[in-house]
């Protein structure tokens, strides 16, 4: 019978989607997503910092946030998805 609390013994562990192999795949997918998110954040930081250093004595440009807003939204959605996947793994 399946030992996971989600299925409460409804079938053999080999049939359960929560088997160790599946959890390992979810974990590696979440880690891959986290690595991609970190790379995206590093690239975004690099793109904004060289501009900030180039015009450090001038006023900040108001158009910088609308330029990167889609990237920030995408990064937030990916982070939420990774957190959701990790939360489901700990059930």
UniProtKB/Swiss-Prot annotation:
Localisation: Membrane; Mitochondrion
Residue span of motif BH3: 33-47
Record-annotated membrane-spanning stretches: 69-87
Record carries keyword Nucleotide-binding: no
One Pfam assignment: Harakiri
Matches recorded under PANTHER family: ACTIVATOR OF APOPTOSIS HARAKIRI (PTHR15056:SF0)
Entry comment, domain topic: The BH3 motif is required for the induction of cell death.
Protein name as catalogued: Activator of apoptosis harakiri
Organism lineage string: Eukaryota, Metazoa, Chordata, Craniata, Vertebrata
């Amino acid at each position: 019978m399946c030992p996971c609390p989600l299925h409460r013994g409804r079938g053999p562990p080999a049939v359960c989607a929560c088997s160790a192999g599946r959890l390992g795949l979810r974990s590696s997918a979440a880690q891959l997503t986290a690595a991609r998110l970190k790379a995206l954040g590093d690239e975004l930081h690099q793109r904004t910092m060289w501009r900030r250093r180039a015009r450090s004595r001038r006023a900040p440009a108001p158009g910088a946030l609308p330029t990167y807003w889609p990237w920030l939204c995408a990064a937030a959605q990916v982070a939420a998805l990774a957190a959701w996947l990790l939360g489901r793994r700990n059930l």
